[in-house]
Amino acid sequence: MKISDGFWMDKKGYDVRYVAQAYEVETTDHEIRVLATPYVVQNRGMTLAGPNLEITYSSRMENIIKVHIDHYRGGLDNKPKFELAEDEGYLPEIRKEKDSVVMISGQTRLEIALGDHWETAFYYGDRYLTGGADRATSIIKESNYIRDARLQSQWEDDFFHPAKDPRTTYLREQLKTGIGECIYGFGEKFTPFVKNGQTVEMWNNDGGTCTGQSYKNIPFYLSSQSYGVFVNSSDKVSFEVNSDTVSKVSFTVPGETLEYFVFGGKNLEAVLERYTALTGRPALPPAYTFGLWLSTSFTTSYDEKTIHHFINGMAERKIPLQVFHFDCFWMKEYEWCNFEWNKEMFPNPKAMLKRLHEKGLEVCVWINPYVAQRSRLFAEGKENGYFIKNKDGSVFQCDLWQPGMAVVDFTNPAAWKWFQGLLKTLFDMGVNNIKTDFGERI
């Protein structure tokens, strides 16, 4: 989210207030609490208004330092949250020095300047990682006319759009980068691997594989200087990687709270170990999933004879194959999803799956969370209330992707149990894996 108009000014319609001073600093056994003001307070009269930010620094795991920033605390805490494995029993070392207050977690250290200026610095041992100074931490107010124009543009799109968000307050942090430092990460991305110079938005979209949009956004970046930053928000986090200010990575979130973690390590592998220790690690999938998967691809015209031609061709070329994947057209066109094989192409799917298994293959099929009007499942879903509805109680439908398609309402327990039953039918038939496509823009 670019707010600046060059280095000296901000864009019209935005009021930006930067933290200028750690006015009050309190320490406990496990955290540092800072009352941060937007100017250096020189007399009592300057304490009559804000905005102030209350910043809490803590560490619940070795070599991980958490920064939590609040403006207003009276809002509703109703956003989805990431599950984190913090150790409530872990205590960092905290001490006050002449010109700073220091937190030490393992070999990772944070220093916060005291006095009439704002500065934070993160180190791993004696090695500087990153930090903030003047014009780093800020609160941003968006003018109503900017908000109204933003909302109007979203209302004009009746389905595939970001959430319509009327909030006009944003919190932003800007952390320094050094000469030659490279930034990586942010989840699945199709833009250049080195992210310097890019604007990176954390919002899952069905945007294909050749734009800045992506399907699996993760608000974590990794630096070539062996540190990482994770923004703990499932909201629409916007990163500017040396693209708004060329020597900083900035991240902005809508609302009154911003929380992020800094991970220190001796190398990139150690940083990733700390990140996954906090956020979790996936279970190890079956061994065959690491092998080669062969797909029908999207619009290929295929039947059982065609797929055996593909599979036999791999064997003739001595290319080992573990999984064969059927994309959308295993079902009849205009009927996705109906969870039924196209009988014109696959008259005996159970026998076909058995033959594929006899060749030592696992089988995967494609699905999505939509039900076309011509699907045999549409009437059942409508009658039982399994679909997302309009405000008037009618089924929401559109013609994007499949004509007249409805969207399964997975907030309805009866709907997802129904959907589970449809999946079980496939598994009982001999399908081993499911490609769960779409759903990003709902």
Which sequence ranges carry the predicted segments?
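Catalytic and substrate-binding clefts that recognize carbohydrates or anionic sugar/phosphate headgroups
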Residues: 1-4, 15, 38-39, 47-49, ...
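A low-complexity, Ser/Thr/Gly/Pro-enriched, surface-exposed linker/loop concept
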Residues: 2-43, 47-99
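A residue-level signal for beta-strand positions that form part of recognition/binding surfaces
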Residues: 31, 226, 289
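Short amphipathic alpha-helical segments with coiled-coil-like heptad repeat character
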Residues: 65-66, 228, 427-429
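Generic domain-boundary/flexible-linker signal
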Residues: 68, 78, 231, 240, ...
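Alpha-helix boundary/capping detector
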Residues: 74-75, 83, 246-247, 301, ...
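Aromatic-lined carbohydrate-binding/catalytic grooves of carbohydrate-active enzymes
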Residues: 283-442
